[in-house]
Amino acid sequence: MMAAVDAILAGKYPAKAHARRVAESLQSYRNGCPGIVYLEAQKTRLIEDNDEPAPFRQRRPFFYLSGCPLPDSCLVYDLSEDQLTLFIPPVDPEDVIWSGLPMSTEEAQNQYDVDRVLVTTELNSTLASIVSSHGGKAIAFTIADQVSESTQFHGFSEVNHSVLKGVIEQSRVVKDEYEVALLRKANDISAKAHIAAIKASQTAVNEREIEGAFIATCIANGAREQSYHPIVACGENGATLHYGKNDDTLIDPVTNQKKRNVLIDAGGEYRTYCADITRVIPVGGKFTAETRQIYDIVLQMQTECIAMLKEGVQWEDVHAHAHRVAIRGLLKLGILRGAEDEIFEKRVSVAFFPHGLGHYLGMDTHDTGGNPNYADKDTMFRYLRVRGRLPAGSVITVEPGVYFCRFIIEPYIKSPESNKYIDTNVLDRYWRVGGVRIEDNVLVTKDGYDNLTTAPKAVDELERLAAS
């Protein structure tokens, strides 16, 4: 499988196809008028009060239409002529002393899927030439606050800052073969890193050691950046969805024994594309009885939800199904009590599963085009990052979870509307579980799905790796 992926990635990133996709969506805003798309790369900048460069992250709209990771660059796409021009910085002799020769225009032409490559000092003359060739009736589409003061749109009939960003973000929802290969590669590297993290738990005494094993494996395999700050949460820390400390001891101060589970939510970024994977590590090679019970519920939630995926499925329906499975499992354990339908309608399960089932994935971890409604008064759907039907070619995370967060659950216990559905005597046995989340990255296809994530999640395999 990965040999075929590497063969695809040996080719050029399909920037021209992406430009054409964006151009098609811009037609209704042009009214037959010629136009251009203008995008800038991220600028190099220094850390505040320092002469060191700040961490660089390429602007996603620019990368989507260029495949170019270089800072201080820009592009122009002539919509009428179907000509994509990349502009890269010229040689700065003083910078060569420190950093060596930069990429030449000839090298860039060979590497990127563009029609021509010029240097940035030629930008304004090129813009003037384009607008002149169209008789001064061209529209320039660009993104607000992402245009340098030195860029000149003299002669253009209109400069539209309002529509391009949204058009690109919607175009990014459906991935092509090359993008899927990038996401699969990011997942493959991240799976190796998760295995390394699981094995590291055997000797680790602090969360940071597990984080270090994950990051080191990503870098060694070609993913130099993380998709997001890793979450490495032992014990009750796992009840915090975006826990970020990653510096707690794995030794329980009461028992002086190792805490028995670590939630790790982490993914490497490969050539701008992200993986986003969550696993729970049975520290010492064995889940506690309570953690295993919750893990089985969450794995069932994920298994059934992934099986529902195909082109056109309503994501809200999949999310609601996850809650149904959670309710059944928690009823069986005795944490919840009462009728399933009543618990569902009263939204009591939100106390244990407060977030959305998943989000689009691509160049951003929480990728664009999901149309969330964070003002939704229905607490079950308020934090669902994707609303509506899933198109074939979209990649979505499926990440159900069950959590025992006192801050979230205690108001439900105190409320007369919901406390009758929660058995606190049974619940008290599960606080130390913290949280269980299982997350995979799944490609939606016409008739089903393709799970891009290969990191182990079966209980026997996790326990074997954690014991090795």
UniProtKB/Swiss-Prot annotation:
Entry's EC annotation: 3.4.11.9
Positions with a binding annotation for Mn(2+) 1: D276, E399, E439
Cofactor(s) the protein needs: Mn(2+)
Biological processes annotated in GO: proteolysis
Pfam families: AMP_N, Peptidase_M24
Reaction equations catalysed: Release of any N-terminal amino acid, including proline, that is linked to proline, even from a dipeptide or tripeptide
Cofactor note: Binds 2 manganese ions per subunit.
GO MF annotation, one: metalloaminopeptidase activity
Positions annotated to bind Mn(2+) 2: D265, D276, E439
SMART domains associated with the record: AMP_N
SUPFAM superfamilies: Creatinase/aminopeptidase, Creatinase/prolidase N-terminal domain
Keywords assigned by UniProt, alphabetized: Aminopeptidase, Hydrolase, Manganese, Metal-binding, Metalloprotease, Protease
Family listed: Belongs to the peptidase M24B family.
Function: Catalyzes the removal of a penultimate prolyl residue from the N-termini of peptides.
Record's protein name: Probable Xaa-Pro aminopeptidase pepP
UniProt source species: Aspergillus fumigatus (strain ATCC MYA-4609 / CBS 101355 / FGSC A1100 / Af293) (Neosartorya fumigata)
